[in-house]
């Protein structure tokens, strides 16, 4: 498969680049709107039958359900193909619904790289099977989605986008059923430096509007403190221990209810006074 912006290829698909296809910018560095290196028709396909997708992963081809008779890198619904399979055709690297192939299976068999219309596979799924790299008409997958399935990197049967998105399903990396995306972006909207859904080419960040409960979108992003102070919802429970919201290395807070036995949450915190009137809950120090 082609790889935008990487001379040596990307990840396991074309080694030398990192999982994000290192060296690519948020806009798939070095790739033009036509998916750099691929023609407007997506490498051998006519512009009327293939939808180019461009991202910094080992993907530079057409949406797997294009209707042309043959494609350079991706398959049509009934024709042969170089790397991706169609619903009824044979293949070189991927399987069709009824035909065997070099690396993948047919309609009912598993496969190494791409799947048929009904068969699951190691890397790509069919219409009902999960997949990792390419999707079928109805199956979710790890990297490419089907018409109703979520995805991480590529698009499904109806919704194209910069990096991902199925026709009805959300995705892990980029836009949804109606919206394309650049680096981030939800189902309809793009994003700047943060917010929206998370892209593989855009590390999650805090929202410019502040650090509320939805500020950090995944465990990959260090939790932010609430700008209003150190309330109970300041740090997110899934990725933050009950620290004060004053700094990233803040010691545990005392219970706001007083200074009982549960006031200080670890031995790292100075003990509070036994009476609630002489305890400062935020920093676990005594009022003396």
Curated annotation (Swiss-Prot):
Tissue and organ distribution: Restricted to hair root, not detected in any other tissues.
Assigned GO CC terms: cytosol; intermediate filament
Repeat positions for Sequence: 49-52, 55-58, 61-64, 201-204, 220-223, 239-242, 249-252, 268-271, 278-281
Superkingdom to which the source organism belongs: Eukaryota
Region spans: 9 X 4 AA repeats of C-C-X-P: 49-281
Keyword set, alphabetical order: Keratin, Repeat
Subunit structure: Interacts with hair keratins.
Entry's family note: Belongs to the KRTAP type 5 family.
Protein's job: In the hair cortex, hair keratin intermediate filaments are embedded in an interfilamentous matrix, consisting of hair keratin-associated protein (KRTAP), which are essential for the formation of a rigid and resistant hair shaft through their extensive disulfide bond cross-linking with abundant cysteine residues of hair keratins. The matrix proteins include the high-sulfur and high-glycine-tyrosine keratins.
Name of this protein: Keratin-associated protein 5-4
